[in-house]
Amino acid sequence: MRGFDDFLVVYVGAGIGAALVMGGEVRRGSHGIAGEIAYLRQNGRTLMERLLGLGITTAGGLSLDADRYRSPFAEQPDSPAAVDFLELLGEAIGNTATLSDPAAVVLSGPLVDCPAFVDRLRASLLPHLLEPSTMVTVSDLGTEGPLAGASLHARETAVEGIWAEYRR
């Protein structure tokens, strides 16, 4: 994200995940699983397990059912399911931000095109941010952000491999 070296990109789609950028570089962790916020636990249950209780996940609870979680924002943005979903998501993002202290939280995924979702998620997230100046914004890349990031990573990996061979 232009203007920031430290930020958290949160994707909400069929899954919920995040990319942590620190010092201008994506931090993947030792095992490549940094940012898997769907698996954050509270009271012994992961975020996905708690969302399963709201009836917005697929049958096995491994992914979100897009039709089920989009409809509350389009039809009844104040419904208990929408409010609970946003509170759980805001809490998980806030906990991740507490650990990483980003200058910005960037929202991406299919729902960022829904202003009601973005506004309500921002309102649910802000009380969970320890630093009130943390910017909460929407990705300029919209739903294409993860694809652009994966493409860039593939390119960087290929170039790195070429240079490693060249240096031998």
Residue positions per predicted region:
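Phosphate-binding/catalytic loop of phosphoryl-transfer enzymes
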Residues: 1-46, 155, 161-168
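ATP-binding/phosphotransfer module of carbohydrate and carboxylate kinases, centering on a glycine-rich
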Residues: 1-3, 42-168
